Amino acid sequence: MCKLCDDKVPHHHFGSRRKFLKGAVATGMAAAGLNLFAARPAAADNPPMPGQRYVIRGGSVMSLDPKVGDFAQADVLVEGKKITAVGPNLQVGTDAAVIDASGRIVMPGFIDTHHHQFETALRSFLADGVLINDGSGTPAGTTTYYEYILLKFAPVYRPEDVYINELFGGLSQLDDGVTTVHDVSQIHHTPQHSDAAIQALYDTGRRFAFGYFEGAGTNAPKYAYPQDATRIYGQYFTSTDQLVTMIMGGEVYLGDAIYEQSWKIGRRLGLQIAAHILSPFGIRPILNSLAKGQGGINKDIGLGPDNLFIHMTGMSEDGWKGVHDAGAQVSIAFPIEMNMRHGMPPILKMQSLGMEPSLSVDVECTLTADFFTQMRSCMNLQRVVLNQMILNQGLPPDPVDWGLPGHPPDVPKRIVWPTPPDDLPAPLTTRDVLRFGTVNGAKALRLDGKVGSLTPGKEADIIILDATRINVVPLNQVPGAVVSLMDRTNVETVIVAGKVRKWKGDLLDVDLPHLRQQLEASRDYLFSAAGIPQNLFSSQ
């Protein structure tokens, strides 16, 4: 069990680890008891010390910034939190530490714009499930996300469960090279639950946007959503010079009165407002009203550039026009949408409007949170649909031979292609989906002035990928290798705001065996409290 709230004593969760640990000691909880950040033995090749000037030397640098460009072999200079130079053979003097990146790919960290991290202990539980029992009668199983995760599991979470789930899920993604997350956890049953989530996000040591959403299925007497947003913002998120930001959750499926209140609170605080927008929840007419500026109980809520919409499946032309014209952001979770019956991921619709999405993981109770899967799924889905559109235009086989030796004369030889229509979207490329997973993620979270590319002046959120491993070598094309071949085993080093968090394949300052025990204890409690039997070979 996580030590955050031992003996059922809720603790005040401060905006820094130092204050948090002091508070723990003051309540009789020794900081050593946490054992989350145990010292590691010295390595033969140690990472740069925090704040030390260093250069990443000799890697294949993919900056994702057209003005900076790409380099087959180049260096990245980091001073403090920021990138100060990118280019070949940088002259950095003798005081800079050197990270040897030969045989490696150096690129920006991935950015996940929608992740329900509180569900980490429920990984794989819903691998065969769909979103909701929609009454279709199709054989999709009775174990659905809405009925099980939100209505059975979510209500029994304690603050200590929130903490360890958020912490472990965040560290797992950090290990995978995801340096920024928008945490969308509908687990805010009480202010203590919210504080536990925020503290875990801080303790993960990566950049995050804290999404303040409702508490799913709760009847807690201390339920304070959405009013507690004001306290949370004032306590944790007023500084712009930190790794953390806040986003206001404003789910329109909660009803006109509640979402109007949450949207108005968010806009008063100057926050982005995020919501799941998808047809299985009957949201199409609500989005149509918002597109007309007639949303909410008073019919005065409209769309804006401060909106971040998740999924956007099954929406009308009017809804899409409103989102486009407002300059709102869209996050697509391709693998989840394809598997859980959210509807067709709207990548072709976005292309037709000149829009691009960011990428997101959604839920690990069904699918993996690694970003290589997100990028591949995006590219594969768009291409299978587009390729079939192209094939459907083909005319009957033409007798012209392919020119291949021994080609049987009775086998169709070639399709005759008409001129393709002007509005046919372009096939996505590996570079496109890399942009979706980095630059577009930063834009979606209003962080593009800080991160998303290897641009001098931006903060150093950098990943170093090993291209010498057996699944990649020989390296022939950098974007293709990252998207088409790599997985988390290739993520060798991860840097957040200049600080090395993963080094030579290992997370730093983390006692994973201890955290794993805490996560498993939380899992056991959650299943028991929800009245759901644990069965390793059944999907219920």
Feature names for model-found ranges:
Residues 1-19:
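N-terminal secretory signal peptides
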Residues 24, 29, 33-40, 44-54, ...:
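Histidine-rich, glycine-flanked metal-binding segment
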Residues 45, 187-320:
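Metal-coordinating catalytic core of metallo-dependent amide/deamination hydrolases
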Residues 121-162, 281-306, 326-329, 373, ...:
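Active-site gating loops and adjacent loop-to-helix segments of metal-dependent hydrolytic enzymes
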Residues 125-184, 189-206, 227-239, 520-522:
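Alpha-helical scaffold segments that flank or form the walls of functional sites
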Residues 300-301, 348-469, 485:
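His/Asp/Glu-enriched, well-ordered alpha-helical/loop segment
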Residues 438, 443, 459-510, 514-516:
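C-terminal cap of metal-dependent C-N hydrolases
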